[in-house]
Amino acid sequence: MRVAVDAMGGDNAPAVEVEGAVVAAREFGIPITLVGDTEKLRLELAKHNVQGLDIAIHHASEVVGMHDAASDAVRRKKDSSIRVAFDLVKSGEAEAVVSAGNSGATMAAGMFVLKRLKGIDRPAIAQIFPTLRGKTLVLDVGGNVDCKPIHLVQFAIMGEVYARHVIGVEQPRIGLLSNGEEDSKGNELTRETNAILKNISFDYEGYVEGRDIFNGMVDVVVCDGFVGNVVLKLSEGLAETVGKMLREEIASSLLSKLGYLFVRKAFKNFKKKVDYAEYGGAPLIGINGVAMICHGGSNVKAIKNAIHFAHEYVRKGVNQRLAEKMETEFTAYMQQFDAVKEAVAG
């Protein structure tokens, strides 16, 4: 089960991608194909001990930059590292893709090359957030900045199926992110979506606020990609800032340093819970394949974990199970959606 890594995507490519791949291959025995400029990748690999590791290189002459249009991965730069990585999955030379590059391009290439699961209009990027009660799945966190109610309803259905059959939540609670809990709150998009979700037969809790993501009030939080990406970046920035503040306070006096010795383990556990690198990346749910989208500034640990999680998804047949469930349950849910939409409109 080989994982194709877009080695040219990300802020620190290819050094971080190559080292992350080497560590993943060494720790987990995962076969990996690095996709990108052969000469540059060979130079990076030469810095590491790769003896006995199954790491191959597949040349790609182009790179989709962070500021390039997402469509470049499909139309103009057909030999880009991200496009070629998905081509390897399509041809059976790899089973999953990991990329820290342009997320829009990754999504576009995934949809164009691997296609979408049956009934899905738009795949979504799903991110797991740590909470007081465990985990909360938030989608979309950046794939679709402009959405219609049908898209948010599909995100809710995908999130419900994913939480139940992948994360293992027996009866996922679904919430729609808004600026208040009252039905009168929100905008036109959320109000119409809220009215429809209330009449679909799963555990829909209604509107939730940003704070509810972290208190574990619901298991799945639905929002458009613009709002979701703001939530994601805000969370990352807050965690980083809190960490810096704590380190400054600890270093401010001898008493603080002594006190830290007694709570050091607790701080380390807290840091691990809020470190995005622990989760590696976010799965792109809704395409006919496995893809992990990583933060552009991912470090070696994040790339390593993203490769590991992608490999585990393939090994456990997660996408096949999800596709089967989506085909049966999604169809039933969408039949309800059509009926409810007509009733709401009427």
Swiss-Prot record:
- EC code: 2.3.1.274
| Enzyme class label | transferase
Q: Does the keyword Transmembrane apply?
A: no
Subcellular localization, per the record? Cytoplasm
Coarse class of the protein's main subcellular location: cytoplasm
For the keyword Lipid biosynthesis, the answer is yes
One GO term of the biological process aspect: phospholipid biosynthetic process
Q: Which reaction does it catalyse?
A: a fatty acyl-[ACP] + phosphate = an acyl phosphate + holo-[ACP]
Q: Which GO terms describe its cellular component?
A: cytoplasm
Name the source's superkingdom.
Bacteria
Pathway of this protein?
Answer: Lipid metabolism; phospholipid metabolism
Q: Which GO terms describe its molecular function?
A: phosphate:acyl-[acyl carrier protein] acyltransferase activity
Q: What Pfam families does this protein map onto?
A: FA_synthesis
Q: How does it assemble?
A: Homodimer. Probably interacts with PlsY.
- Return the NCBIfam families for the record: plsX
**What does the UniProt function comment say about this protein?**
Catalyzes the reversible formation of acyl-phosphate (acyl-PO(4)) from acyl-[acyl-carrier-protein] (acyl-ACP). This enzyme utilizes acyl-ACP as fatty acyl donor, but not acyl-CoA.
Instruction: Return the similarity comment.
Output: Belongs to the PlsX family.
Q: Which HAMAP family would you find in this protein's record?
A: PlsX
* Name this protein carries in UniProt: Phosphate acyltransferase
Q: Which organism is it from?
A: Geobacter sulfurreducens (strain ATCC 51573 / DSM 12127 / PCA)
**What is the gene called?**
plsX
